[in-house]
Amino acid sequence: MGRWLRLLIIYISAIFRKKIHLTDISNLSFRVWPQEADKKYMNNASYWTITEIGQMDFLFRTGFFKICRRQHWIPLVGSQKMVYKKPLKRFERFQLRSQLNYCDDKWLYFEQTFLKNEQLIANSLVKVIFRGKSGNVPVSQILTSLSTEVNLPRKALIDDSESIDEKLMTR
């Protein structure tokens, strides 16, 4: 299924699905389609496309997307890391869990987990900033605009003593 069609389906379904809080986990179900696979396994680019769709579902269902449109803010990815544990084959069903994991003064960090039958397939960490007309939007302003009490950890998921690969695979 094409990226834009999936995004349209997610947008429409978000209207009818339960709204979530900024600290909740967004769960989506997918299937690997032939155009997403090289030979017989889902390719790396498709994993990233799915993470973007998961992030958009999160933004739609938290109400953050409406605020971004009203404020003319756009999300920009600063960095992203994916660790693959097992491959997904054509036509296999899998789930994507997306959550806002922590923040600092400038960045929001999303963790996204690919699961098949509750088994870890891959895990990603995506660092996102929002930019408005006058530059980068501070996280404090973002949280204020959501008019909700949020207690996100303000400490990094990964410290200097361990690698991101090890941390993402043990979650």
Q: What is the predicted function of each stretch?
A:
Residues S46-R69:
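Active-site helix/loop of acyl-thioester processing domains in fatty-acid/polyketide metabolism
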Residues T23-I25, V77, R93, W107:
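A general secondary-structure signal for short beta-strands and their flanking turns/coil
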Residues G2-G54, E162, E166-R171:
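Catalytic strand-loop segment that frames the active site of acyl-thioester-processing enzymes
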Residues S29-W33, V83, I129:
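Generic structural detector for well-ordered beta-strands
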Residues M1-I15, Y84, L88-R93, Q99-R171:
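HotDog/MaoC-like acyl-thioester-processing domains
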Residues S26-F30, P75, Q80, S124:
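A broad, low-specificity signal marking well-ordered, structured residues that form hydrophobic/aromatic
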Residues F30-V32, R93-L96:
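Short beta-strand segments
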Residues C68-R90:
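Small beta-barrel nucleic-acid-binding modules, principally OB-folds
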